[in-house]
Amino acid sequence: MDMLLNPLNRRHRLRHDIPVVPGAFPLVGHLPAVVCDLPRLLRRAERTLGSHFWLDFGPAGHLMTSLDPDALALLRHKDVSSGLIEDIAPELFGGTLVAQDGIAHRQARDAIQAALLPKGLTLAGIGELFAPVIRARVQRWRERGDVTILRETGDLMLKLIFSLMGIPAQDLPGWHRKYRQLLQLIVAPPVDLPGLPLRRGRAARDWIDARLREFVRAAREHASRTGLINDMVSAFDRSDDALSDDVLVANIRLLLLGGHDTTASTMAWMVIELARQPGLWDALVEEAQRVGAVPTRHADLAQCPVAEALFRETLRVHPATPLLVRRALRELRIGQQRIPTGTDLCIPLLHFSTSALLHEAPDQFRLARWLQRTEPIRPVDMLQFGTGPHFCMGYHLVWLELVQFCIALALTMHEAGVRPRLLSGVEKGRRYYPTAHPSMTIRIGFS
């Protein structure tokens, strides 16, 4: 199938001596091809234009995209800013850690990160909270016999996040509805009229923020209680830096957003890979039987190397965050390419996670690259979680819940004598932007 490129825009041109990929449409640029066929678009651009080229992201403007491995160093560079993220999606990411650098980023991060480290998660009993929720969900899958996997993992992740926040069961439908409306801000056109996505998304964000402020007040009134939100508020209040509650609320909302879509996608891909590679399923079942129960503490995760390898290899082959954006604050060089001050940059993690320059046999889904390694995990192996000051604070939480999910799935299905099986094709319907996920229609059977 041809890529979704504009056949009337074939002119080759340069911006700052860097080629622009032909085929952009008016208003939306290259977004149709980025959303539906990003890997092929990057390969074609590299083959015809080289390692550096401009892609048109429509409302977000032109981003200089680099496939040179030296571009990864920009993620830690002091003269590269994350502020572009807020410029692209101010309604969602304004005031959050992902869009900040320097002192503001450090102050906010230091104020809340302790609750998300292994010790904080263990003290808050997060593993004990998640385990029965995960077991109940995969038990329902077994009883039903087949599921639309991405929809199910998305619902499970929302259930876990809402349980993390202590939202009462009777309030869950309202939160589900507002959360779905909040997500519209990711792609909302900049038109603020009643009934349109921008207006609905802003109203949902304000509704969610108001409830989060109520959680913060309740946490302060009951300071002796444990739980992730209580621990985050307690750590925030003990911080040496005088920060407003707006900072805390914005970053709890970020936890809600970041913990759902990308993790649900990874979870769905894990099930898909288990369904299409019987040997992986057999290895996971063997490990789950040996462990005997869903782990609840980070200290227990070392007993589950197969589940951990499945989590890491899935993230490598199917990165849920395919692109990172930054802005050059001064003139830089990537390899031999000069990058002018103020250039908006795109660093395609999707390309680097499957690059032969960085990984052996990159197109093969191989748990052995994790199970047989003797050296520590490298920063390049965890690109999905960022690097340097912007390393994802939710890393340990994601690691815990995905290993828990693997073990619960294997124990539950093996007990019934069934295994996951693909009931539909995988490649058609994949999406790559703003986050990547498998087709919404993929069905998995358990038989």
From Swiss-Prot:
It is an enzyme of class 1 (oxidoreductase). Gene3D superfamilies: Cytochrome P450. InterPro entries: Cyt_P450, Cyt_P450_CS, Cyt_P450_E_grp-IV, Cyt_P450_sf. Its cofactor is heme. Its EC number is 1.14.14.-. Keywords: Heme, Iron, Metal-binding, Monooxygenase, Oxidoreductase. Heme binds at C392. GO terms for molecular function: heme binding; iron ion binding; monooxygenase activity; oxidoreductase activity; oxidoreductase activity, acting on paired donors, with incorporation or reduction of molecular oxygen. The keyword Metal-binding applies. Belongs to the cytochrome P450 family. Cytochromes P450 are a group of heme-thiolate monooxygenases. They oxidize a variety of structurally unrelated compounds, including steroids, fatty acids, and xenobiotics. This is Cytochrome P450 BJ-4. It comes from Bradyrhizobium diazoefficiens (strain JCM 10833 / BCRC 13528 / IAM 13628 / NBRC 14792 / USDA 110). The lineage of its organism: Bacteria, Pseudomonadati, Pseudomonadota, Alphaproteobacteria, Hyphomicrobiales. The gene is cyp117.
